[in-house]
From Swiss-Prot:
Coiled-coil stretches: none
Transmembrane segments: 577-599, 614-634, 646-664, 689-709, 735-756, 770-792, 803-828
The family this protein is said to belong to: Belongs to the G-protein coupled receptor 3 family.
Species assigned in the record: Rattus norvegicus
Name recorded for this polypeptide: Metabotropic glutamate receptor 3
Tissue: Is widely distributed in the CNS. Predominant expression is seen in the neuronal cells of the cerebral cortex, dentate gyrus, and glial cells throughout brain regions.
Keywords for the protein's UniProt record, in alphabetical order: Cell membrane, Disulfide bond, G-protein coupled receptor, Glycoprotein, Membrane, Receptor, Signal, Transducer, Transmembrane, Transmembrane helix
One GO CC term, this protein: presynaptic membrane
Cytoplasmic side: 600-613, 665-688, 757-769, 829-879
Length: 879
């Protein structure tokens, strides 16, 4: 025990030496408030602001200093008058000034531990005569400490007080470091740690989509740990820090000007987050005012709702969003504080300086060349507004009182006064067993809900609740308006917020992308991007990804998804359809006229000599070719597609099979005559019909196999260069369609060959010449059609129209070259539609009278000479 006492005395000597030396270095009169009591509470308040240069202390801190100090005195008075809380026990105080500096606060706090070091156990020290040692100027024994205000101050003081097991309750220190019970195991606070505030600030930035911001922090635990917590919360929300600045303790104007210059180097970071002490915030706003720099400030409770911070610089702070711990005004304190004046407040040694500073007057004549203070000056609603943390100061004092009350009830059950067990307090027991377990309704709170409960969590922290304020101008006066609150979640009244430029500011590294653009993030930076337009056929999966809608689909107007494009095909009312349909109808009408004429004159020599059966088959094929136009114009469907594939090749096969049968018959007849052979076989009408049908059947079989192997159907086709158009087509390739005409091409070639071979037949066989003209013209049409068909493959309208017109032209060629001359003779030259017994040849000589091979056949054959040989010929006149 003696060893421990000597160690404490040695520590006191060391501390006292440093303390006295430090006081000797400064011309600053040490002031304090000492009020004796049964139990004494220490108090630490930033009564003076931080000094400049070599000065420790500056001007009087009117709100955070004087008001908070008086709030503690007010709470002590109320507790001492309370008959239920610590009845019979008088609380005293020992209040010191921290001058807003942690080092100065540590020096001052040595006063609190002096009593623990200098208290001498009377039983151990006795005089030679047996009397006890006399102790003079004994320091007040501190039961607990209320304070400090700044986190850096509380951290320094807590490190000292824990050595002597003195509990400490702060009313304003919010550094997250103070939640570490392994280091600050005698510290508690009525305010929440800063990581709640940091989370609230980050949620405000995310709410307004401010993803690229600058930060400024005060040097010290409050600013540094607060901004560190904010940066962690910002990263979780993909918010980037453009530049992170720090204001040192030098309090030099140049340092603040330098910070503003650095902030201006990031023009896209229009929002600046401040985690600063009040005096640092005021100096920074003043520096911004000097260069007329405009930012949107988002500030912590170090700024809060203090008008003194923006005084004289309101226009550069206009629109600022600030946070303040959720609290209610203590109306009883208002009445108490407004009743104070220098003439009735003698226990506060700083109150006279406060009065002179507030009213800009002097309580002594000719002091600082100020006018003498009017004795009628008073604190009232026109010059006073309650500081935001008064409630927390009162709650801190009451929390300590409740803990002492429970301890006194436990240790001294039979008395309302202090018993011997409490004369030497066990600080550890007071903190662990009583202080951390207090739970009471806040005094002077008009609301009796959950928000009025005062208690500590396991880390000694208060509950996290914040009000959100907006600096506004109303009627030429600047004031803070509450626009929201945060308690686990953010709630904002956006419509009531005023902005410096009348609209929500933007603070982003890159400009927002257009609705049709995606963000291409830059490596290592989640807030800077390059906007890349999506392709017209792409939609936005998210703001970073464009995705192809796929063939046949197109993005919606807002690019949030895709929809199926309407199918495009030729409509009957389209100009692309009207032309081919008109031509086909005209051709079909002409075909009907020819058929009608042939049927009406079915038994005339000309019709008989033309080979009626093959002519009717040929006319049917021509009619079918005209019908193909309607199939190609109609909306594609499985049935229509089957008819297209079946009808196109078959219609041509019918036409060219009939023509091939005719030309083959003529060629065989004349080849037989030239070779001196007898009448060729299979030249009768029925034989020719069967031959023709056989040739047609080959095409039908081929097409049928094709239809079986490749089932007809439709497909939605999109050209790569025209993704916005979906064409409804048959599920057959253009090349397959043309390959299916291979057999027809063979028929055309054979017809052309036979027509060429029989081109020099006698006049009465000049039908072969007309067949030749037909085939030559058909070849020209198809030779022109094929390149056009392939070249126009990108435009299905042109391709389809070309196909229809080409098919119709083939029909017109047959009608014009083969049937038009016959119809003309039948209708307009009937005198030529007779039987002749001798042929009149221009360059061929007749060798004998006509002799009929068969009188009963459809044609009468006579011997004539063709190129000097006797041949068979029909009996009709030349066409």
């Amino acid at each position: 025990m003696k060893m421990l006492t000597r160690l404490q005395i040695l520590m006191l000597a060391l501390f006292s030496k440093g303390f006295l030396l430090s006081l000797g270095d400064h011309n600053f009169m040490r002031r304090e408030i000492k009020i004796e009591g049964d139990l004494v509470l220490g108090g630490l308040f930033p009564i003076n602001e931080k000094g400049t240069g070599t000065e420790e202390c500056g001007r009087i801190n009117e709100d955070r200093g004087i008001q908070r100090l008086e709030a503690m005195l007010f709470a002590i008075d109320e507790i001492n008058k309370d008959n239920y809380l610590l009845p019979g026990v008088k609380l005293g105080v020992h209040i010191l000034d921290t001058c807003s500096r942690d080092t100065y606060a540590l020096e001052q706090s040595l006063e609190f531990v002096r009593a623990s070091l200098t208290k001498v156990d009377e039983a151990e020290y006795m005089c030679p005569d047996g009397s006890y040692a006399i102790q003079e100027n004994i320091p007040l024994l501190i039961a607990g400490v209320i304070g400090g205000s700044y986190s850096s101050v509380s951290i320094q003081v807590a490190n000292l007080l824990r050595l002597f097991q003195i509990p400490q309750i702060s009313y304003a220190s919010t550094s997250a470091k103070l939640s570490d019970k392994s280091r600050y195991d005698y510290f508690a606070r009525t305010v929440p740690p800063d990581f709640y505030q940091a989370k609230a600030m980050a949620e405000i930035l995310r709410f307004f989509n401010w993803t690229y911001v600058s930060t400024v922090a005060s040097e010290g635990d409050y600013g540094e740990t607060g901004i560190e917590a904010f940066e962690q919360e910002a990263r979780l929300r993909n918010i980037c820090i453009a530049t992170a600045e720090k204001v040192g303790r030098s309090n030099i104007r140049k340092s603040y000007d330098s910070v503003i210059r650095e902030l201006l180097q990031k023009p896209n970071a229009r929002v600046v987050v401040l985690f600063m002490r009040s005096d640092d915030s005021r100096e920074l706003i003043a520096a911004a005012n000097r260069v007329n720099a405009s930012f949107t400030w988002v500030a912590s409770d170090g700024w809060g709702a203090q008008e003194s911070i923006v005084k004289g610089s309101e226009h550069v702070a206009y629109g600022a969003i600030t946070l303040e711990l959720a609290s209610h005004p203590v109306r009883q304190f208002d009445r108490y504080f407004q009743s104070l004046n220098p003439y009735n407040n003698h226990r506060n040694p700083w109150f006279r300086d406060f009065w002179e500073q507030k009213f800009q007057c002097s309580l002594q004549n000719k002091r600082n060349h100020r006018q003498v203070c009017d004795k009628h000056l008073a604190i009232d609603s026109s010059n006073y507004e309650q500081e935001s943390k008064i409630m927390f100061v009162v709650n801190a004092v009451y929390a300590m009182a409740h803990a002492l009350h429970k301890m006194q009830r436990t240790l001294c059950p039979n008395t309302t006064k202090l018993c011997d067990a409490m004369k030497i307090l066990d600080g550890k027991k007071l903190y662990k067993e009583y202080l951390l377990k207090i739970n009471f309704t806040a005094p002077f709170n008009p609301n009796k809900g959950a928000d009025s409960i005062v208690k500590f969590d396991t880390f000694g922290d208060g509950m996290g609740r914040y009000n959100v304020f907006n600096l506004q101008q109303t009627g030429g006066k600047y004031s803070y308006l509450k626009v929201g609150h945060w308690a686990e979640t953010l709630s904002l009244d956006v419509d009531s917020i005023h902005w410096s430029r009348n609209s929500v500011p933007t603070s982003q590294c890159s400009d927002p992308c257009a609705p049709n653009e995606m963000k291409n993030m830059q490596p290592g930076d989640v807030c800077c991007w390059i906007c890349i337009p999506c392709e017209p056929y792409e939609y936005l999966v998210d703001e970073f990804t464009c995705m192809d809608c796929g063939p046949g689909q197109w993005p919606t107007a807002d690019l949030s998804g895709c929809y199926n494009l309407p199918e495009d095909y030729i409509k009957w009312e389209d100009a692309w359809a009207i032309g081919p349909v008109t031509i086909a109808c005209l051709g079909f009408l002409c075909t009907c006229i020819v058929i009608t004429v042939f049927i009406k004159h079915n038994n005339t020599p000309l019709v008989k000599a033309s080979g009626r059966e093959l002519c009717y088959i040929l006319l049917f094929g021509v009619s079918l070719s005209y019908c193909m136009t309607f199939f190609f114009i109609a909306k594609p469907s499985p049935v229509i597609c089957a008819l297209r594939r079946l009808g196109l090749g078959t219609s041509f096969a019918i036409c060219y099979s009939a023509l091939l049968t005719k030309t083959n018959c003529i060629a065989r007849i004349f080849d037989g005559v030239k070779n001196g052979a007898q009448r060729p076989k299979f030249i009768s009408p029925s034989s020719q019909v069967f031959i023709c049908l056989g040739l047609i059947l080959v095409q039908i079989v081929m097409v049928s196999v094709w239809l079986i192997l490749e089932t007809p159907g439709t497909r939605r086709y999109t050209l790569p260069e025209k993704r916005e158009t979906v064409i409804l087509k048959c599920n057959v390739k253009d090349s397959s369609m043309l390959i299916s005409l291979t057999y027809d091409v063979v028929l055309v070639i054979l017809c052309t060959v036979y027509a060429f071979k029989t081109r020099k037949c006698p006049e009465n066989f000049n039908e072969a010449k007309f067949i030749g003209f037909t085939m030559y013209t058909t070849c020209i049409i198809w030779l022109a059609f094929l390149p056009i068909f392939y070249v126009t493959s990108s435009d299905y309208r042109v391709q389809t129209t070309t196909m229809c017109i080409s098919v119709s032209l083939s029909g017109f060629v047959v009608l014009g070259c083969l049937f038009a001359p016959k119809v003309h003779i039948v209708l307009f030259q009937p005198q030529k539609n007779v039987v002749t017994h001798r042929l009149h040849l221009n360059r061929f000589s007749v060798s004998g009278t006509a002799t009929t091979y068969s009188q009963s056949s459809a044609s009468t054959y006579v011997p004539t000479v063709c190129n000097g040989r006797e041949v068979l010929d029909s009996t009709t006149s030349s066409l």
